[in-house]
Design a protein with these regions (language model features):
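Conserved thiamine diphosphate
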Residues: 1-30
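Glycine- and acidic-residue-enriched helix-capping/beta->alpha junction motif
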Residues: 27, 31-33, 138-142
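Charged, amphipathic alpha-helical interaction segments
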Residues: 25, 32, 87-91
Length: 163
């Protein structure tokens, strides 16, 4: 999260090969310095690459799955867990919207707010620390903008770290 505090520095943490390809191409075209953080457990990830599609620009999240009951917001490797969680919830007749942030700076506040205002519930998945983290910022955005509609408190789930 400390990288997000550096003025003018863009930060990308893509989960999908197509996003990594297009975000890297966008980074080459802009004047802002950009940091790409690739999760090593995503290196063997395969997927369709559409070279003709320009892809979404920095600061635009990708809604991987539309839903109406809960918004699951994440980035990088945890997107895989978000998608699995949505599949499990679907078996329980719970419709989860999955949002892949793709870039953490600029952060797509509008997509987060719009989704949570629609679903009225939010789960933020991350591998980071519990405090002073990206999920802390996302939770803050949700509370500042959606507190009147929330049916339950926002849940932050942090993947256990191995150290």
């Amino acid at each position: 999260s400390w990288i997000m505090h550096t003025p003018g520095l863009f930060l990308s943490m893509p989960a999908k090969p197509n996003d990594a390809y297009h975000l890297l191409r966008h980074a080459l075209k802009i004047d802002n310095p950009t940091i790409f953080i690739e999760h090593k457990l995503l290196y063997n990830t395969t997927g369709t690459l559409d070279k003709n599609d320009m892809g979404a620009p920095f600061g635009k999240a990708n809604i991987l799955r539309k839903g109406k009951d809960v918004s699951i917001i994440s980035y990088s490797r945890m997107i895989n867990y978000a998608e699995k969680a949505a599949e499990i919830l679907e078996k329980e007749n719970i419709s989860a919207e999955v949002i892949d942030l793709r870039t953490l700076y600029p952060l797509d506040r509008e997509t987060i707010i719009t989704s949570v205002n629609k679903t009225k519930r939010a789960l933020v998945l991350s591998e980071s620390y519990y405090t002073s983290s990206v999920p802390s910022e996302i939770t803050s955005i949700i509370f500042e903008n959606c507190y009147k509609v929330l049916k339950k408190p926002v849940i932050r789930h942090h993947h256990p770290l191995q150290w």
